[in-house]
Amino acid sequence: VYFGEYLLMVTPMFWAWVGQTMFFNRFGEKIKLPELYMLPQMFFLILMTASFDLTFSNTYYTFLIGYLGIRIITVIQYFVISRQLRGNPRRVAILLGSVFLLGVITTATSVFFDGSVRYLVMYLGIAIDIVLPLFLSKTLQKVPVDFPHLAERFGLFVIIT
């Protein structure tokens, strides 16, 4: 039971980390004042971490606020950077921002449900974030990620968790 709840909490945290890492991997050098985005995300990450509880349903709303805060800021970053870009990089930024916005909206609707349905809806939003970009790989390959950097970031996350 506790392992299942642990996975319920760690998976969104992992995905928030992945989303931010992927953004900075592709566009981090181009964004102005990245700390304006990172500092609020750190606050939301602290909120998520403080929401870890053996009875996850007791802290679900604060956890969700933390998760959505991080993801909304990431979506904003994609749309902000898209205004500075041209061609394929612009298309990729708008595409990812739009897909992730759909995931955020879906996850946010989990507040209207209780019990297992709540978690199902939350994970449906995360699944949208993960699966839809897989169908867009031809477009995304036009602005590739730096895989050695990603491997280092994933290794760091594993060590931390």
Kindly give the residue locations of the regions a language model identified:
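Multi-pass alpha-helical transmembrane bundle typical of ion/small-solute transporters
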Residues: 1-161
